[in-house]
Amino acid sequence: MTNRLPPSLYVPPHQRLGSDYGFNPVPLSPVRYVSAYDDRVSEDRQPQEGTFHCADLDDWNKRFSMLLKDSLKQEVISREKKDRRDFDKLAALATTLGLYSHAYAKVVVFSKIPLPNYRFDLDDKKPQREVNLHTDLLQRVEAYLTEYLSKSSNRIDRVPANSVSRTSSISSTDEWFSEQPLPISATKILWQRSLQLRDRQQYWQASVEGQRMLDSRTSLPAFKQRHSVLTAISQNQVIVISGETGCGKTTQIPQFILESEIEANRGAFSSIICTQPRRISAMSVSERVAYERGEQLGESVGYKVRLEGVKGRDTRLLFCTTGILLRRLLVDRNLRGVTHVIVDEIHERGMNEDFLLIILKDLLSRRSELKLILMSATLDAELFSSYFGGAGVIYIPGFTYPVRSHFLEDILEMTRYRLTPYNQIDDYGQERTWKMNKQIPKKRKSQITFVVEDALRAADFKEFSPETRESLSCWYPDCIGFNLIEFLLCNICENEGPGGILIFLTGWDDISSLKEKLQIHPIFGNPDLVMLLACHGSMETFEQRLIFEEPASGVRKIVLATNIAETSITINDVAFVIDCGKAKETSYDALNNTPCLLPSWISKVSAQQRRGRAGRVRPGQCYHLYPKCVYDAFAEYQLPEILRTPLHSLCLQIKSLNLGSISEFLSRALQSPELLAVQKAIAFLKIIGALDENEDLTTLGRYLSKLPMEPKLGKMLILGAILGCLDPILTVAAGLSVRDPFLTPQDKKDLAEAAKSQFSRDHSDHLALVRAYEGWKKAEEESAVYDYCWKNFLSIQSLRAIDSLRKEFFSLLKDTGLIDGNPSICNSEGNDANLTRAVICYGMYPGICSVVHNERSFSLKTMEDGQVLLYSNSENARETKIPYPWLVFNEKIKVNSVFLRDSTACSDSTLILFGGSISKGDTDGHLKMLGGYLEFFMKPDVAEIYQTLKKELDELIQNKLLNPKVDMQAHRELLSAIRLLVSEDGCDGRFVFGHQILRPLEISALSTKPSLFSRTESGPGGDNSKSQLQTILTRAGYTVPMYKTKQLKNNKFQTTVEFNETQIMGQPCSNKKSAEKDAAAEAIQWLKGGAKESHEQVNHMSKLLKKGKKDHL
């Protein structure tokens, strides 16, 4: 047991050393694996039923013991049918010994380490692609390449080091924070500004309006502890403030510090940064604080969020998102000039916040005068206090009016509303979702249902009426309950007093669908009676401000919100809360490297926060749409984001800040992520070329670290700028960063899809986005934006956000020095859709899946998931045939199955040239990618052209990154050859399965054998004869062979294989599997004729079969 690896360490299958395949290893013969998707291999008989004997158990017990003692082996693999049949018993035995087990269709695996859901090394249908290019195309490409290589000796790709352009050390974003050092003579100016700030503050405080505002502020619980807070800050470097919702900590604590500094004539010398987890919080809080100080934004108080901000010469208190402060740390590790850092809402445990805390903890030792104030809305302050070495804690009680809680059983009892299997269905206006919900009783239990099952089973609800108990018995936890919410709103409006209503939902889909449902209601859709609003983090600024406005007299405000309204913002006039009890959050399955986006139950703390929103201005009521017993089963706190999301962006930031080893740095987190998640992130950054093998930033990685976006989007922008197609790539990168602009109203779904189809060509969701944006820009020039968006079911807000992000991304690229700001130079090839597709492939890699067609449709498969599906709103999801072999995709999400979002089809040439690194396979004309998952077979001269083009392209990109002044026109022959390949590759190749490569040692060993295809299991080809025969028949256009096996009187088995109206019988064998292999080997021996070389044999057999097929027709 001492040699076992830690459970969190997962070694990819192709990197493992000691696996026991079937317990009968044959060193030289290739191994045949099968998968769950091998539905074309015929097995005409079911496994014979048998019993599980004690002898089998004893045998496996010995094998497991040997595995545990063997330090080189990690797993045992069996393909025996009896082992698959008895897998449950064997798995139970393995578990008792501390082993992991998994059944992969026709393979069972027992391992020392956890096993993923899919293993490509056990799948004989992993992508193996035969690449075929027209001779004419190859000749033209080769001519360009030959000319290019002939000029390479005279080409100068680098200019002298002293003329290389230098990039600014402070980007446009960082200028918001930049505090340039002042000469000593300027100190007098700062003292004068400090006096001016003090005079201005005293004048406001003495005014009538200032006194009125002071009276309002003094009513807040936080104000009553002003002196103790300021004293604690002055006496400690770090303090933690735990303040209940409504206590005023977010608006008052930063003011206390600012007022104190200004009053002490240190105003101009102070710089206070207060981080908020969301942009809407930073903006709304800054506006409120400025208002309480009798100022306009941009005077002593300002804000900075992505894309916008307000800051003036005298701004001393700046509210910003956490990401903005992290950007500042890129150029200023010591936060020069900053006197106070306030991190608000730390209880939310966002990844950026946890990351920032690690950095600040290290910074405090270098900046002893820097003050750090951590603020939390929950009672977990001791966790943060202990992390900072026992920092002082101040508790501020909140003030809320009493709030009555009504759980689902109470709601049903007092309103007499009845739940049925049908009135709980939430109509999202999408056919697939509707159908899924209609089949709820037939579906397996979801995670939402599973986690509360025991609580529901234990509850008896005896004190409630039979009608309520019957309703509860058919309650479906997965539903939000749109119909019940509408009923509750009617009940509140008819029977309760005035006050706003805040409804907590899981995400934008819920918000938009429920809003559409309510807008057709005679009351809720009437703006003279109801002010119906949405609150979501991605909304535009002017929309967000509406939720804080007072409604007109006689109008009731109803706000549909996500968990953003729990603590980040306060809507003062809310008196009623409806809580669905769920939030949509991303979890991360590191073992399968798959993010999962599923609604999950909130924590008890979150439920309490939601309830507290109803008691800000008057006694309130909260309606929880779940039973009390379910609430009792909630976790106390939410899982930190750093433990449930992919870490590659965070790891890139760690390296860009020169924080040392990624694993070591993250081990210092408040709660460190599991080792496997860190390893997956590092592996991803190596695959995309951002890190080298020593985990140091590459040249590409340094550029990516300067771009505050997903690394794959940054890669696209960089290559788009280099290859001259930046404009469409700016649109793609911006479009993938905002909400999908294509709308699908529930009552106009067909019309919306028809409108989207106008933009959807070339089997690319990304290019459809480009065309929609370009149409919007043209409509903007003609002042017809509203009509354009209305007719094409496009979101004006999303398109505006894309437009803003495009400008920001262009500015960021300019700051890196890669472009000089002249759009014409970086858009010379902007109209080349095939080149744009190639750049998208470059950015999306390794998000790649194969497209394998069958008679009616096609199947998709990725390296880590096996079979996957497309989201229903994808253009490619509506296709029955995609004339490309590959799809690249932006992201995958596991809901029930794994779904791919935002895909673009691409050719073999595009993937080989713009995917990841390629390596030479085991023979000429064999190329590998992604650790051998992707295999390409082609003529050796074609492989040589691909390898040369790939090498030259990679060198050109590297040189351009090192020296942005490299003249791309000097490489026009290379670029012409590449454009020619990606535009004229007709995807004439085909997928093959079980394609085996014989290594030189094997070939020499075979030279003394009379037949290439041996009937013995130990001989080359014997283990794989069925696969070989199937490949030959498939190439010739036939269906797979059929095997018929009979048991002889001597207990041996004999198989007859049928294909092309031909029957061939094999020799009797000891078991059914061997008999089938022998029959297949006999068939291949019959087909191969007189050809001597292995590839000649295959060609001869294929020609023979095709001729026979033609003669038969």
Curated annotation (Swiss-Prot):
Coiled coil (residue ranges):
none
Identify the residues that bind ATP.
Answer: G243, E244, T245, G246, C247, G248, K249, T250
Localized where?
Mitochondrion
**Sequence ranges assigned to domain Helicase C-terminal in this UniProt record:** 484-658
Where does the protein principally reside? mitochondrion
Q: What is its EC number?
A: 3.6.4.13
Motif DEIH box is found at: 344-347
Keyword Ligase annotated: no
Report keywords, A-Z: ATP-binding, Helicase, Hydrolase, Mitochondrion, Nucleotide-binding, RNA-binding, Transit peptide
The name on file for this protein is: DExH-box ATP-dependent RNA helicase DExH5, mitochondrial
Species whose genome carries this gene = Arabidopsis thaliana
